[in-house]
Swiss-Prot record:
<dbReference type="InterPro" id="IPR017261">
    <property type="entry name" value="DNA_mismatch_repair_MutS/MSH"/>
</dbReference>
<keyword id="KW-0067">ATP-binding</keyword>
<dbReference type="GO" id="GO:0005524">
    <property type="term" value="F:ATP binding"/>
</dbReference>
<dbReference type="Pfam" id="PF00488">
    <property type="entry name" value="MutS_V"/>
</dbReference>
<dbReference type="InterPro" id="IPR016151">
    <property type="entry name" value="DNA_mismatch_repair_MutS_N"/>
</dbReference>
<keyword id="KW-0238">DNA-binding</keyword>
<dbReference type="InterPro" id="IPR007696">
    <property type="entry name" value="DNA_mismatch_repair_MutS_core"/>
</dbReference>
<dbReference type="GO" id="GO:0140664">
    <property type="term" value="F:ATP-dependent DNA damage sensor activity"/>
</dbReference>
<dbReference type="InterPro" id="IPR007695">
    <property type="entry name" value="DNA_mismatch_repair_MutS-lik_N"/>
</dbReference>
<feature type="binding site">
    <location>
        <begin position="641"/>
        <end position="648"/>
    </location>
    <ligand>
        <name>ATP</name>
    </ligand>
</feature>
<dbReference type="InterPro" id="IPR027417">
    <property type="entry name" value="P-loop_NTPase"/>
</dbReference>
<keyword id="KW-0227">DNA damage</keyword>
<dbReference type="GO" id="GO:0003684">
    <property type="term" value="F:damaged DNA binding"/>
</dbReference>
<dbReference type="GO" id="GO:0006298">
    <property type="term" value="P:mismatch repair"/>
</dbReference>
<dbReference type="Pfam" id="PF05188">
    <property type="entry name" value="MutS_II"/>
</dbReference>
<dbReference type="GO" id="GO:0030983">
    <property type="term" value="F:mismatched DNA binding"/>
</dbReference>
<dbReference type="Pfam" id="PF05190">
    <property type="entry name" value="MutS_IV"/>
</dbReference>
């Protein structure tokens, strides 16, 4: 609606001046909940009030009328704002904070008693732009992302920034990998062009990934505009100052900087230039695999039971965030992986140093986020103190290394220790200026040390010794006048005054004594000196707070100039924390250093699942370790055996071992030789996707299709029960053909678990496939799951035994056994296997299927060479094929 329609709807012309001010500001922020500061409360009106009262659980009241209808209103105390903002941000609302820009007294002085206090929006808070500790998690990054998908290109540009830590990155992402990349980053908010609103991509982002999308008009991403924004923001003359970036990346970076500028108003973040990321530098793990393996969250989205919760024994907040990033993005460069492993091994070999360093790290603060708050004028004296204490502790950590090693530190350790050297200029600045007990709120005063500035000392002297100054002035006037009975008194009418008895009035001859009042018994005077003292006493508290704010802002500017140093220091501390953490868990849990090879080795001896092992240890139970020996000659393990025997755990543990190894950690195994894994795919279990109208089987097939399309020779595929969501013959056929495709086309490493025992004969003609099963012990009708993976194939699933363990009624179990016996007798009469092993052709079954004639479409496909088609020719051909298909 336009402004005239808006004014009419809300009765603008009949509203009070204050309400007109509210409506003016609200119209400029229609996409936000507007929190309007009125005294000690932030108020909301109309639809905002109705919505917020429900979300926040606060009372809905009324204020005035709009025509015949009362205006809904609700409010929250200003001092409790962050608590309420937390709820609004969790619900993905966009909130505009409208503050008073002057005091009521200043408004009266400006425009009389009817003047409305000046107000304006000082900040817009969105899920991707929060920096307050209460509004963000300590471990996960809080990314705002901008995704630019150019037309007729197969690569998108993605820029993502964490405002709370002042970090920003940009990466080119293959179009097929966009959802996987977003799943890696888990941005709280994604900027997307309006023309993509109805696209499948936008639908998948919001429904499948459940991420918030903020749409912007197409011009928001215009390349020329975005380039100018970047140049202005970083004060550069040439875009090459950022690095070699594409037009799409320019649009992604520029749009994020513009959005941050719009939402943060005057408090522009001090972001470094974007770090350009190579998409292929880290392992690809798709959305469903991250969910199945429970890498950073469990299957319900929580932390308990995730791989992160098991591995995270970091002692700093920034260390926890770095570990989260490591687990989200395992490396694919074996040289860099080994560099990390060297650091882990150093700390593992020097556990005495590790223990001392970890104790000191506990005393450091999250200076990344402290620095951001300071640079954006939302910091406090305590943030500065946190930086000072961290500088001091970092220096102590550095001394531990040099005390033990002197100058013989390994170069890779010296590199991360060197930034710990204390910046004395910065340390001394904070030490000399900020009170040790500085409050969070600058308005409370007491932030700046009295000794830091003479005026601060003078004002505090006035505040603390006001009566003493009055006494000194009284004694001075007694000497000057010779009147011993002279007093200095105070009342609410004339303030401070010199009080002299009437009989002594003739002794006042000095013109500096100004007559104020005569009473029956006394004459009252003042002096310029006394007036100044009174003014200073009255205003001292206000003046000292104002002066402290000025000095604090100057100190913050000087600290901000050291941003690069502080970021490097924070990075060093977080890295040391993570590698000490790796050493700690390795020593506590008997992990070993993995060895990386240039082939397809995946040779794990006595491997364990770290999360399951941790859970069993709490129950004082032991985890049964297993080997896994994949190689060029034996790329595929087909694993059969009963449910509950440990197949799924075995599949997951090997994928997890690959991830742990490639983040630079030791692994839960006796030994591990691994050929670098570029992608991990896991299809384990499935659930109906009712929102998208997909059955279990359709969801399973979509995941399997994506795996087969995106895997490379260096990938690791984990498949569990492919084909189980349909009829037996269909399921066996699909599982068979998938195995063949992986073996013959992809030629990558694969662990394939199945209940289709018919597949075990495939080792006769798939030379790189071997059968493995789960060892069990049978005693009559009872079975014992040994959880050991052994060579061989299972011929039974023992499903009825599992059903009995689950507590099904005995009558149901007995009946199931009778039915199973009949099926087994019938199968024996017809021949044990329905599958033919005599032929290696595409036909799975002994019964020959009727031959189908090729359709015209199939004949047409045979003539097409997709590598020689231009994008335009491919599109035209697609329309032609669609038309022919409809005719057929």
């Amino acid at each position: 609606m336009n402004f005239q329609e808006f004014k009419h709807k809300y009765g603008y012309d009949a509203a009070t001046k204050m309400m007109q001010q509210y409506l003016d500001i609200k119209f400029a922020h229609l996409d936000c909940l507007l929190l309007f500061r009125m005294g000690d409360f932030y108020e909301m009106f109309y639809e905002d009030a109705v919505l917020a009262s429900g979300v926040l659980g606060i009372a809905l009241t009324k204020r005035g009328k709009n025509g015949d209808e009362e205006v809904p209103m609700c409010g929250v105390p200003y001092h409790a704002l962050e608590n309420y903002l937390t709820k609004l941000i969790e619900e993905n609302y966009k909130v505009a904070i409208c503050d008073q820009l002057e005091t009521p007294e200043e408004a009266k002085n400006r425009g009389g008693y009817k003047a409305v206090v000046n107000r304006n929006v000082t900040r817009i808070i969105t899920p991707g732009t929060v920096i307050e500790e209460n509004l963000i998690t300590t471990v996960e990054p809080n990314y705002l992302a901008s995704l630019v998908v150019p037309k007729n290109k197969d690569t998108a540009a993605l820029c993502y920034a964490d405002l709370s830590t002042s970090t920003i990155f940009v990466v080119n992402v293959p179009e097929l990998e966009i959802l996987n990349e977003l799943a890696r980053l888990k941005p709280r908010e994604i900027l997307l062009s309006e023309h993509l609103r109805s696209s499948d991509l936008a639908s998948n982002i919001s429904k499948q990934l459940n991420f918030r999308i903020t749409y912007q008009v197409d011009s928001f991403f215009a390349v020329n505009k975005c380039e100018k924004i970047i140049l202005d923001f970083y004060k550069m003359k040439d875009i090459k100052g950022v690095g070699e970036i594409s037009n799409s990346q320019i649009c992604a970076i520029g749009s994020i900087l513009e959005y941050l500028t719009l939402t943060q108003k005057e408090n522009i973040p001090n972001l470094p230039k974007p770090k350009i990321i190579d998409f292929h530098s880290y392992m690809t793990i798709d959305f469903s695999t991250r969910r199945n393996l429970e890498i950073v969250t469990n299957s319900c989205g929580g932390n308990k039971g995730s791989l992160l919760s098991t591995l995270n024994h970091t002692v700093t907040k920034q260390g926890g965030r770095l570990l989260y990033n490591f687990l989200s993005s395992p490396l694919t460069d074996t040289h860099k992986i080994n560099q990390r492993l060297n650091i882990t091994e150093f700390f593992h070999s020097n556990l005495d140093i590790t223990a001392k360093v970890r104790e000191l790290l506990k005393k450091t603060s999250d200076i990344e986020r402290c620095l951001t708050r300071i640079t954006m004028n939302r910091g406090s004296g305590r943030d500065l103190l946190s930086i000072k204490y961290t500088l001091e502790t970092a220096n102590s950590i550095k001394e531990i290394f040099f005390d033990n090693y002197g100058f013989e530190l390994p170069s890779f350790i010296e590199k991360i220790v060197k930034p710990l050297i204390r910046n004395d200029e910065l340390y001394n600045l904070i030490e000399e200026s900020i009170c040790e007990d500085a409050p969070n709120n600058l308005n409370d005063g007491g932030v700046i040390k009295h000794s830091y500035h003479p005026k601060v000392l003078q004002l505090h002297d006035l505040i603390n010794n006001g009566k003493l100054h009055i006494e000194k002035l009284k004694d001075q006037y007694k000497k000057e006048t010779g009147i011993d009975s002279l007093k200095i008194s105070h009342n609410n009418v004339i303030g401070l005054f010199i009080d002299i008895t009437a009989k002594n009035a003739n002794k006042i001859n000095d013109p500096k004594f100004i007559h104020r009042q005569t009473t029956v018994n006394s004459v009252r005077y003042t002096t310029a000196e006394l007036q100044k003292l009174e003014s200073d006493l009255v205003n001292a508290k206000t003046l000292v707070v104002s002066l402290e704010k000025e000095l604090y802002e100057d100190i913050c500017k000087r600290v901000t100039k050291q941003s690069d140093y502080l970021r490097i220091l924070a990075s060093s501390l977080s890295g040391i924390d993570v590698f000490c953490n790796f050493a700690y868990i390795a020593s506590e849990n008997d992990y070993t250093r993995p060895e990386f090879t240039d082939d397809l080795s995946f040779d794990i001896v006595k491997g364990r699942h770290p999360v399951v092992e941790e859970a069993l240890n709490k129950e004082r139970k032991s985890f049964v370790h297993n080997d896994c020996h994949l190689s060029e000659a034996e790329r595929i393990w087909l694993i059969t055996g009963p449910n509950m025997a440990g197949k799924s755990t075995f599949l997951r543990q090997n994928a997890i071992i690959a991830i742990i190894a490639q983040i630079g950690s030791f692994v839960p195994a006796k030994s591990a030789r691994i050929g670098m894994v570029d992608k991990i795919f896991s299809r384990i279990g499935a659930a109906d996707d009712l929102i998208k109208g997909q059955s279990t089987f359709m969801a399973e097939m979509l995941e399997t299709s994506a795996i087969l399309a995106q895997s490379t020779k260096n990938s690791l595929i984990i498949l569990d029960e492919v084909g189980r969501g349909t009829s037996t013959y269909d399921g066996v056929s699909i599982a068979w053909s998938v195995l063949e495709y992986i073996h013959d086309k992809l030629k990558c490493r694969c662990l394939f678990a199945t209940h289709y025992h018919e597949l075990t004969i495939m080792d006769n003609f798939l030379p790189a496939m071997q059968n493995y099963t789960i060892a069990i012990e049978e005693s009559g009708k009872d079975i014992l799951f040994l959880h050991n993976i052994i060579a061989g194939a299972a011929d039974r699933s023992y499903g009825i035994h599992v059903a009995a363990l689950a507590g099904l009624p005995a009558s149901v179990i007995n009946r199931a056994e009778q039915i199973l016996l009949k099926f087994e007798k019938n199968a024996a009469g017809k021949g044990k296997n329905i599958l033919s092993t005599e032929s290696n052709n595409l036909s799975l079954f002994a019964i020959e299927s009727p031959k189908l004639q090729n359709s015209k479409l199939e004949e047409k496909f045979k003539t097409i060479d997709p590598d020689k088609l231009s994008p335009k020719e491919a599109l035209e051909l697609l329309y032609q094929l669609k038309s022919n298909f409809i005719k057929q």
